[in-house]
Design a protein with these regions (language model features):
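Small beta-barrel nucleic-acid-binding modules, primarily SNase/OB-fold domains
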Residues: 2-5, 15-145
Length: 145
């Protein structure tokens, strides 16, 4: 009797603890505040506590776009194109969803970002406005400049 009671308690407690650690992996962005460059923007995510989800910097996972304050004219020009592309996509979207949230070394949220079911990273890559990035050394946008 004691053993079966113990087994029931263990099964119940493990299922409760598994449920309490399950966090949603997809969040709807309630407001786009600003788009700094092609891979970084600020947003509100009402599903998260204010300390985490209010005016939070989000960096798009898996890509790097040129820097607005780049090292050469080519990089700065491409940076403006990437930023404008991201602005148009995010501000004109019916829905923006962030998935697979992580933190980077600057405490920004890293996420896969979708606008109207289109992955923003893929769209930027397809338009030549981003390169794949895994957190190592960044590519130079100023080659042959």
């Amino acid at each position: 009797m004691k053993i079966s009671y113990l087994v029931i308690v263990l099964i119940f407690s493990s299922s409760v603890s598994a449920q309490s650690t399950n966090q949603p992996s997809d969040y709807i962005v309630s407001e786009i505040i600003s788009v700094y460059d092609g891979d970084t923007f600020r947003a509100n995510i009402n599903e998260l506590p204010d300390i985490v989800g209010k005016n939070v910097a989000i960096r798009i996972l898996g890509i790097d776009t040129p820097e607005i304050k780049g090292k050469c004219k080519k990089e700065k020009t491409l940076a403006i194109k990437a930023r404008d592309f991201a602005r148009k996509a995010l501000f004109n979207a019916e829905v923006v969803i962030v998935k697979n949230l992580k933190r980077d070394k600057y405490f920004r949220l890293l996420a896969d970002v979708y606008f109207d079911n289109t992955k923003l990273a893929s769209a930027l890559l397809e338009n030549g406005l981003a390169v794949s990035y895994s957190g190592k050394k960044k590519s130079s946008w100023c080659k042959n400049d």
